[in-house]
């Protein structure tokens, strides 16, 4: 019994306030640390100080590695730093890293879930040299087409914006690379809901672009991108370019083909394989993945597979009026010029 009373007394002591006597200091706790000393230096074992700061190239490489971070803010800030580095570099100076090294890290961000990351990515792509982008068009297009057929409406719009930039930078390479013509047109028709005769029986309605408050702005962007794409693929060639090419090919000779009719058809063709579309001795092939290097080949495929669907879609878009109707007028203008010019000579 005595031990239990002692334990109760000790427990009760913890909750009693100690009475301080005059002239005596308060008792210090057991975990008290004396901080009254003064030191001239403080040494940290894990501190690393360098006389020189990291170079701009090292910082550029570091931010490239941060593009795969799980944080949306980190990816956006890294893209902003890379964009600033590219814009502020001296004229005609090489990039800190070649485009072939940057693209494998940048391209997956086309499908990023964060809109701020995709917006900053487009700014970075526009800061890259156009000449360096032309050689990597086949590497860019699969990601763009994946974004154009994405389930999220904002990602589809961002992918269309990237495609518009790519056509402005390297339009000839986009429409002539393997799969760049038919596959991209199929993506446009899928987004716009302009189905061909084969797919109209089972395909659904036009893909949605999100909230109705957008007032047709996404649709306008898609139509504008389609107009630029068709202009690059089957648009009427510039007559001045044709004249200059003729002068370069035959200097000092003017109008030598006057007595002949369709003289270009009897000359050595400029294409590497002018009769490849006939597939005389080859095996059955995939038309969607082929390269259509000449305007004649692209117009032939467009007329056979897409012309009817595009014309029907333009009529329905023109009936909507407003900005969508004006955007469809731009596509109609390009289409009329292409049809008037025909397959060319």
Swiss-Prot record:
Task: State the compartments where it is located.
Answer: Nucleus
**InterPro entries per the UniProt record, alphabetical:** ARM-like, ARM-type_fold, Ipi1_N
> What's an example GO BP annotation here?
rRNA processing
What keywords is this UniProt entry annotated with? Nucleus, Ribosome biogenesis, rRNA processing
- Comp. bias (Basic residues): 1-11
Segments carrying the region annotation (Disordered) are: 1-30
SUPFAM superfamilies cross-referenced by the UniProt entry = ARM repeat (SSF48371)
Question: What quaternary structure, including any partners, is listed in this protein's UniProt entry?
Answer: Component of the RIX1 complex, composed of ipi1, rix1/ipi2 and ipi3 in a 1:2:2 stoichiometry. The complex interacts (via rix1) with mdn1 (via its hexameric AAA ATPase ring) and the pre-60S ribosome particles.
Family per similarity comment: Belongs to the IPI1/TEX10 family.
User: What is the name attached to this protein's record?
Assistant: Pre-rRNA-processing protein ipi1
According to its UniProt entry, this protein's organism is Aspergillus fumigatus (strain ATCC MYA-4609 / CBS 101355 / FGSC A1100 / Af293)
């Amino acid at each position: 019994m005595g031990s239990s009373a002692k334990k109760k007394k000790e427990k009760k002591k913890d909750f009693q306030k100690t009475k301080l006597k005059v002239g005596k200091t308060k008792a210090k706790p057991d975990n008290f640390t004396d901080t009254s000393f003064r030191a001239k230096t403080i040494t940290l074992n894990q501190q690393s100080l360098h006389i020189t700061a990291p170079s701009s190239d090292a910082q550029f490489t570091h931010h490239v590695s941060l593009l795969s971070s799980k944080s949306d803010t980190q990816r956006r800030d890294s893209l902003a730093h890379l964009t600033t580095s590219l814009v502020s570099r001296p004229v005609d100076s090489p990039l800190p890293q070649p485009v072939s090294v940057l693209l494998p890290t940048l391209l997956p961000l086309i499908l990023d879930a964060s809109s701020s990351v995709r917006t900053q990515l487009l700014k970075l792509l526009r800061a890259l040299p156009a000449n360096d982008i032309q050689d990597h068009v086949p590497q860019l297009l699969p990601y763009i087409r994946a974004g154009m057929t994405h389930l999220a409406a904002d990602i589809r719009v961002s992918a269309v914006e990237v495609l518009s930039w790519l056509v402005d930078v390297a339009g000839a390479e986009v429409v002539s690379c393997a799969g760049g013509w038919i596959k991209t047109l199929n993506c446009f028709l899928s987004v716009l809901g302009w189905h061909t005769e084969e797919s109209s029986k089972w395909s659904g309605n036009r893909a949605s672009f999100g909230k109705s408050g957008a007032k047709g702005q996404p649709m306008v962007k898609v139509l504008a991108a389609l107009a630029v794409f068709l202009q690059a693929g089957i648009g009427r060639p510039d007559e001045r370019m044709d004249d200059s090419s003729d002068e370069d090919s035959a200097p000092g000779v003017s109008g030598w083909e006057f007595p002949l009719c369709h003289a270009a058809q009897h000359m050595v063709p400029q294409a590497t394989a002018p009769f490849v579309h006939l597939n005389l001795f080859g095996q059955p092939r995939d038309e969607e993945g082929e390269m259509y290097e000449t305007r004649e080949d692209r117009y032939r495929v467009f007329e056979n597979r897409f012309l009817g669907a595009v014309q029907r879609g333009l009529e329905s878009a023109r009936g909507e009026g407003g900005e969508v109707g004006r955007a469809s007028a731009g596509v109609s203008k390009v289409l009329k010029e292409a049809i008037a010019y025909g397959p060319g000579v």
